[in-house]
């Protein structure tokens, strides 16, 4: 069927280029270019993301407060009780 790995057939007219793993850097320019790029992207989309979260928070707090107030009894209804 075919040869085993390590003893494969030789292919002609195929050129491959590779870089040694010892010459590669794991995180090149991670702190000098990566973090500022993240901050730039966050600043660009903050006006698209933050307003819905603020609106949801305000609606949620208002709804929770109204729910708690609706569970309370009206003290004026029990003024004449002994």
UniProtKB/Swiss-Prot annotation:
<dbReference type="GO" id="GO:0021860">
    <property type="term" value="P:pyramidal neuron development"/>
</dbReference>
<comment type="similarity">
    <text>Belongs to the UQCRQ/QCR8 family.</text>
</comment>
<dbReference type="GO" id="GO:0030901">
    <property type="term" value="P:midbrain development"/>
</dbReference>
<keyword id="KW-0472">Membrane</keyword>
<dbReference type="GO" id="GO:0021548">
    <property type="term" value="P:pons development"/>
</dbReference>
<dbReference type="GO" id="GO:0021539">
    <property type="term" value="P:subthalamus development"/>
</dbReference>
<keyword id="KW-0496">Mitochondrion</keyword>
<dbReference type="InterPro" id="IPR004205">
    <property type="entry name" value="Cyt_bc1_su8"/>
</dbReference>
<comment type="function">
    <text>Component of the ubiquinol-cytochrome c oxidoreductase, a multisubunit transmembrane complex that is part of the mitochondrial electron transport chain which drives oxidative phosphorylation.</text>
</comment>
<dbReference type="GO" id="GO:0021680">
    <property type="term" value="P:cerebellar Purkinje cell layer development"/>
</dbReference>
<keyword id="KW-0007">Acetylation</keyword>
<keyword id="KW-0813">Transport</keyword>
<keyword id="KW-0679">Respiratory chain</keyword>
<comment type="subunit">
    <text>Component of the ubiquinol-cytochrome c oxidoreductase (cytochrome b-c1 complex, complex III, CIII), a multisubunit enzyme composed of 11 subunits. The complex is composed of 3 respiratory subunits cytochrome b, cytochrome c1 and Rieske protein UQCRFS1, 2 core protein subunits UQCRC1/QCR1 and UQCRC2/QCR2, and 6 low-molecular weight protein subunits UQCRH/QCR6, UQCRB/QCR7, UQCRQ/QCR8, UQCR10/QCR9, UQCR11/QCR10 and subunit 9, the cleavage product of Rieske protein UQCRFS1.</text>
</comment>
<dbReference type="GO" id="GO:0021766">
    <property type="term" value="P:hippocampus development"/>
</dbReference>
<keyword id="KW-0812">Transmembrane</keyword>
<dbReference type="GO" id="GO:0006122">
    <property type="term" value="P:mitochondrial electron transport, ubiquinol to cytochrome c"/>
</dbReference>
<feature type="modified residue" description="N6-acetyllysine; alternate">
    <location>
        <position position="33"/>
    </location>
</feature>
<feature type="topological domain" description="Mitochondrial intermembrane">
    <location>
        <begin position="69"/>
        <end position="82"/>
    </location>
</feature>
<keyword id="KW-1133">Transmembrane helix</keyword>
<dbReference type="GO" id="GO:0021854">
    <property type="term" value="P:hypothalamus development"/>
</dbReference>
<dbReference type="GO" id="GO:0005743">
    <property type="term" value="C:mitochondrial inner membrane"/>
</dbReference>
<feature type="topological domain" description="Mitochondrial matrix">
    <location>
        <begin position="1"/>
        <end position="39"/>
    </location>
</feature>
<dbReference type="GO" id="GO:0021794">
    <property type="term" value="P:thalamus development"/>
</dbReference>
<dbReference type="GO" id="GO:0045275">
    <property type="term" value="C:respiratory chain complex III"/>
</dbReference>
<dbReference type="Pfam" id="PF02939">
    <property type="entry name" value="UcrQ"/>
</dbReference>
<protein>
    <recommendedName>
        <fullName>Cytochrome b-c1 complex subunit 8</fullName>
    </recommendedName>
</protein>
<feature type="modified residue" description="N6-succinyllysine; alternate">
    <location>
        <position position="33"/>
    </location>
</feature>
<feature type="transmembrane region" description="Helical">
    <location>
        <begin position="40"/>
        <end position="68"/>
    </location>
</feature>
<dbReference type="InterPro" id="IPR036642">
    <property type="entry name" value="Cyt_bc1_su8_sf"/>
</dbReference>
<keyword id="KW-0249">Electron transport</keyword>
<keyword id="KW-0999">Mitochondrion inner membrane</keyword>
């Amino acid at each position: 069927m075919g040869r085993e790995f390590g003893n494969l057939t030789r292919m002609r007219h195929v050129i491959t280029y590779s870089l040694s793993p010892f010459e590669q850097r794991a995180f090149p320019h991670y702190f000098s270019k990566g973090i500022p790029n993240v901050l730039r992207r966050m600043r660009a989309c903050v006006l698209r993301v933050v307003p819905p979260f603020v609106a949801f928070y305000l609606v949620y707090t208002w709804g929770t407060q109204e729910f708690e107030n609706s569970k309370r009894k009206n003290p004026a209804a029990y003024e004449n009780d002994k």
